[in-house]
């Protein structure tokens, strides 16, 4: 029987096996759980699914992907040497091995579940030539799928016609319509609900969230997956963790660090907080469409992004 002393509510508004906070890249975990037969509820702060992933160009960096391996373009030893060098001692052999083992499987799962294919990126390839095991035009892949105007589209903005919405839109659709999952939009997760089990250990049993109608409590019998994005729109967290000023962000405006703060509140450790993917941008005050795009969430961008 649950112990209410740690904040377990007397009544649950929703119940599921796996509660997922966010709807960008974390949809991969949501989709995997749903495909395995778990009842999934996705909690999304925005009024549409996809997060920053939907407004991206959809490309991902994955060694040993099936597209490259079909032509024997990659090698596990080379890939391991490369990611070991780039990790620079900030990871573990076990994590690096798991990335190379299960990462390509995740890419194949997305292709099957979201009804898309992957191609070697025709333009952008993120890598450092100076590191051992580096390869060009092999490991950065882009989704090829059906255009989704609802989830957000970045066609042609940076010389590519790929879109993150090729992944997020059909994946979310499959979670709901194929596997019976549920998506709660305009629902902002605020707190992890915990209890003390019979062994005296604190465990997460659900999520408390805020909606326009008030507070809701969502029970998760198996797991809560946090994937609510970064903290690009939280000035206090940027001052705390970033070593240089970060005045602009390409994250959607719902990325305020809630997932990180919720984890901290129940004792989770943090790592690599000062590190982020970024790029140097020269701002021309007279003509700055890119600059404006960085601050525009999908629902407000004049170009429909």
Spans of model-derived segments:
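N-terminal Rossmann-like FAD-binding beta1-loop-alpha1 element of flavoenzymes
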Residues: 16-42
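Extreme N-terminal leader/targeting segments of oxidoreductases
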Residues: 1-18, 35, 169
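Glycine-rich FAD pyrophosphate-binding loop
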Residues: 35-56
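FAD cofactor-binding and catalytic pocket of flavoenzymes
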Residues: 282-305
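Conserved redox-cofactor binding core of oxidoreductases
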Residues: 100-214, 235-236, 283-284
């Amino acid at each position: 029987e649950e112990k209410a002393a740690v904040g377990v509510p007397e009544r649950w508004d929703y119940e599921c096996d796996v509660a997922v906070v966010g709807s960008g890249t974390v949809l991969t975990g949501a989709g995997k759980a749903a495909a395995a037969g778990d009842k999934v509820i996705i909690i999304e702060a925005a009024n549409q699914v996809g997060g920053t992933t939907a407004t991206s160009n959809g490309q991902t960096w994955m060694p040993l992907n099936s597209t490259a391996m079909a032509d024997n373009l990659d090698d596990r030893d080379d890939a391991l040497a490369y990611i070991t060098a780039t990790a620079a001692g900030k990871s573990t052999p076990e994590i690096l091995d798991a990335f190379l083992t299960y990462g390509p499987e995740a890419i194949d799962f997305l292709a099957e579940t979201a009804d898309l294919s992957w191609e070697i990126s025709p333009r952008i390839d993120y890598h450092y030539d100076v590191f051992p095991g580096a390869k060009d035009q092999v490991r950065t892949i882009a989704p090829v799928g059906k255009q989704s105007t609802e989830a957000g589209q970045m066609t042609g903005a940076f010389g590519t016609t790929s879109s993150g919405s090729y992944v997020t839109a059909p994946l979310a659709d499959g979670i709901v319509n194929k596997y019976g999952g549920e998506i709660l939009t305009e629902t902002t997760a605020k707190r992890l609900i915990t209890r003390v089990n019979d062994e005296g250990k604190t465990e997460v049993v659900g999520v408390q969230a805020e909606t326009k109608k008030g507070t809701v409590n969502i029970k998760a019998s198996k797991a809560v997956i946090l994937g609510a994005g970064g903290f690009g729109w939280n000035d206090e967290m940027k001052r705390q963790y970033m070593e240089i000023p970060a005045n602009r962000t390409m994250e959607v405006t719902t990325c305020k660090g809630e997932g990180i703060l919720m984890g901290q509140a129940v004792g989770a450790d943090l790592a690599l907080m000062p590190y982020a993917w970024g790029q140097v941008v020269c701002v021309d005050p007279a003509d700055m469409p890119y600059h404006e795009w960085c601050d525009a969430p999908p629902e407000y961008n004049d170009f429909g992004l």
